[in-house]
Amino acid sequence: MNKKNSYSYEDLLASGRGELFGEKGPQLPAPSMLMMDRVVEMNEEGGLFNKGYVEAELDINPSLSFFGCHFIGDPVMPGCLGLDAMWQLVGFYLGWIGGQGKGRALGVGEVKFTGQILPTAKKVIYRINMKRVINRKLVMGMADGEVEVDGKVIYTATDLKVGLFQDTSTF
């Protein structure tokens, strides 16, 4: 794999097909559960804890599937999708550093929602600050994250945990 510091939408789709990090690497979900359009920055030494940083973006438009059903007459992006996007990015980071296995969200310490994403918004930015990475037989990442819409931070999450598993049949 060619380890890059940014990834296009086509790269993210390749991850969803299992083509980006190899056949045993973690995959992102496919649309409509893929919650980002591009990864604009990745590094192993940056972030608030100097253990890695990921920044990704989602372009908002009223035709996104969730706006049609959540809620009729009062469209808003479900907050859980922003949380899932942060878990997706922690798993993506683990694959980027060479971790193998199927990604699973393992938990989160605290989540705060202080705003909303409406169909009139333009852009969502996700920021992930890795706090701890284990890349041995156990592959796990822990991070703090935030979701910003049009310049305002509206969600924060601490201790996002994602693990990579060789076998998920008994998970």
From Swiss-Prot:
One of its GO terms (biological process) is unsaturated fatty acid biosynthetic process. Pathway: Lipid metabolism; fatty acid biosynthesis. It catalyses: a (3R)-hydroxyacyl-[ACP] = a (2E)-enoyl-[ACP] + H2O; (3R)-hydroxydecanoyl-[ACP] = (2E)-decenoyl-[ACP] + H2O; (2E)-decenoyl-[ACP] = (3Z)-decenoyl-[ACP]. It is found in: Cytoplasm. Gene3D superfamilies: Hotdog Thioesterase. One of its GO terms (molecular function) is trans-2-decenoyl-acyl-carrier-protein isomerase activity. Keywords: Cytoplasm, Fatty acid biosynthesis, Fatty acid metabolism, Isomerase, Lipid biosynthesis, Lipid metabolism, Lyase. InterPro entries: FabA (IPR010083), FabA_FabZ (IPR013114), HotDog_dom_sf (IPR029069). GO terms for cellular component: cytoplasm. Its EC number is 4.2.1.59, 5.3.3.14. PANTHER family: 3-HYDROXYACYL-[ACYL-CARRIER-PROTEIN] DEHYDRATASE, 3-HYDROXYDECANOYL-[ACYL-CARRIER-PROTEIN] DEHYDRATASE. Necessary for the introduction of cis unsaturation into fatty acids. Catalyzes the dehydration of (3R)-3-hydroxydecanoyl-ACP to E-(2)-decenoyl-ACP and then its isomerization to Z-(3)-decenoyl-ACP. Can catalyze the dehydratase reaction for beta-hydroxyacyl-ACPs with saturated chain lengths up to 16:0, being most active on intermediate chain length. Homodimer. This is 3-hydroxydecanoyl-[acyl-carrier-protein] dehydratase. The gene is fabA.
